[in-house]
Each structure stands twice: as structure tokens, then as C-alpha cells.
Amino acid sequence: MKFAVALYHGEFEKSAFEKTQKWISALDTNLEYFEIQKTTVTELLENLIAGAENQNAESVIYTWSDCPFLDLELTKELCHQHEKYGAEYTFADGYPYGITPEIIHLGTLKILLQLSKQNPELGEGKVSRTSIFDLIKKDINSFEIETLISDKDFRLSRLEFASGTKFGKILCERFEKLIEAEEKKLGKTLCATEKCELAEKSPEILQ
């Protein structure tokens, strides 16, 4: 299956986007990506479809571009599950926002586009971080959904790693320093769960 990466841009710091680009290159040096900056959900879907078709991609790996901690191994596992089980929508559950992307099949995007037009309260609304899943929930039993479940549920901690706001940028900078210090101390690279556990027990991240 051919994948393309779609990055949704807000008015974000360039440094966050650079880290996201490194994540894409680490996934696959030949993986193409396209950028979107639209205001409504319907426009977002139209551009996701056009971008996928322009690259002859069957599915889109979708994320906002201000997520500097997207996990490489979890993304690869999501792609594997999406392809293996012929999923229409694949996501990870239990991890903080900003650790994993969403994967949407091209055919699903076309169905969601029609749903967005049938539900103007969503379709004409401004793009949010949950826009895709909000539409899927309108007819959730009609989709083949695959879920990668975290070994530990971090949702109660309300962690979110996105640097698109002033507070988010400060939080991500603190988290990056924590990870670097912990990896230096342990002499190894932390996996996604270990990073999240580190954040969960750090007052400077939870405040």
C-alpha cells in the first residue's frame, strides 16, 4: 500500500515543523508529504483527497505539523495494522495527543467529504484536532476501524504535546529537555511509553 503524509498547518513555530519533517524522513526517505492550511473541515477533506490522488496514494497519514514528538515505531505499527487488516481508519488510543498520527484510506476520505456536506455544523466548522474522528463518529459502525491500544492509558493525565500555542511550545521545550536528560542518564533511547511515563511523573509537565 502506498501512503502519503498530510500535514495540517496552523500559525506554528518553524522548529516544530522541522521536527515533523525529520519524523517523515525517518519513516521512509521516499515518502512524500503535502501541506494543507484551510479553515473548514470540508476544505480540509477536499485537500486531503486531492493530495492523495496527486501522489497516487491509497491512504493518508494525517497529523498537525506542530507535533514534535510523533513516535516513529508507533507510526510504523499503525501503518502495518492499517494495511494488514484493510482498515479504513486507523488510530492509537491511550497515548497523549501528539504522539501518533491518524491514517485514513482514500475511499474513507471521500465518504467523510459527503458526510461533512450533509452535516454542515461540522463541515463548515473550523478545523480542529479531532475533526476527522468527529465525522467518523457520525456513522462509526459503517467503517472498518483499527485501533492500536497503549499498554498504559495516559488519558487521565491530560497530556498533550503540540507546540502551536505559547504554552504548548514551552511545555514541549521542557519535555524535550527531560527526555534528553533521561536518555543520557540511562544510556538508551526511550520508547513512547517510557517518554509518556516520564512526563506523567514530572510536575513541570503536569502543571
Pin down the residues of each PLM region:
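Active-site nucleotide-sugar/metal-binding loop of Leloir-type enzymes
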Residues: 45-59
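Conserved nucleotide-sugar donor-binding
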Residues: 99-114, 166-171
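A conserved hydrophobic position in a structured secondary element of the catalytic/binding core
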Residues: 65, 70, 104, 163-164
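Basic phosphate/pyrophosphate-binding loop/patch that engages nucleotide-derived ligands
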Residues: 78-88, 108-127, 138
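N-terminal glycine-rich phosphate-binding loop and ensuing alpha1 helix
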Residues: 1-37
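Conserved alpha/beta core of the MobA/IspD/sugar-nucleotide pyrophosphorylase nucleotidyltransferase superfamily
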Residues: 129-207
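Short beta-strand-to-loop acidic/aromatic patch adjacent to the donor-nucleotide binding site
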Residues: 56-68
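Conserved donor-nucleotide/metal-binding helix-loop-beta segment in metal-dependent transferases, i.e.
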Residues: 69-97
